[in-house]
Amino acid sequence: MEIGKNNMDTCNMASSDKDVKIHFKVARFIMEAGVKLGMHSVPIATACTIYHKFYKETSLENYDPHLVAMSAIYLAGKVEEQHLRTRDIINVCHRYNNPGSEPLEVDSKFWELRDNIVHCELLMLRMLNFRVSFQHPHKYLLHYLISLKNWMNRHSWERTPIATAAWALLRDSYHGDLCLRYEPQQIAVAVLYFALQCYGVEVPSNSNAETSWWQVFSEDITILTINNIISDLIHIYTMDTEIV
């Protein structure tokens, strides 16, 4: 019995790892399609969050992830008031999956796909109980960066791309489900902490201060939470090297 249990656990782990990689690739698809559609960073983040949240309620076997992704993009555009035409979403996504191809003809296949996107959008709304508006880390990170820039040595700040790195880390975090497992303030602090670490930049007087700089920004956060988020980010980048 123990051998059978171990085999089942191994199969479950392999299946889970496969699912994580699929979600990674589909999240990248959402991000790249979003950029081609001219979406801003917050609507793209909302689309990724809707996608990840939807698959917390169901499994990949039940719904086509690329259809869910297109519907998430369409819905996110409405939520964030950056409305997108289904025709544009369909054509951008079609070209993403079929590089160099011509736009789809407006025929029965096109209208069937359009109807599927709309029906999937309604399904997602029902499954998520119409809770599709989210607080993202973006506004917190912007505030923290401005505060830290005024706090730090100007030369140290200007010679290292801390802000650029922090924004890139935040964007890449949406390849996984960090947005569902941590508070937005925690993610904002963690990506900033990681960016500072990457460039070896120290926050002035932090070692002598009674309160660490990250607790000034988010008083409930701990170094353990920061390290857990960084560990998850490193796992995302490791996965990126493994996925062709």
From Swiss-Prot:
It comes from Xenopus laevis (African clawed frog). GO terms for cellular component: nucleus. Keywords: Cyclin. CDD domains: CYCLIN_CCNM_CCNQ_rpt1, CYCLIN_CCNM_CCNQ_rpt2. The keyword RNA-binding does not apply. This is Cyclin-Q. It comes from the Eukaryota. The gene is ccnq. InterPro entries: Cyclin-like_dom, Cyclin-like_sf, Cyclin-Q_first_cyclin_box, Cyclin-Q_second_cyclin_box, Cyclin/Ssn8, Cyclin_N. GO terms for biological process: regulation of transcription by RNA polymerase II. One of its GO terms (molecular function) is cyclin-dependent protein serine/threonine kinase regulator activity. The keyword Transport does not apply. Transmembrane segments: none annotated. May be an activating cyclin for the cyclin-associated kinase CDK10. Belongs to the cyclin family. Cyclin-like FAM58 subfamily. Pfam families: Cyclin_N.
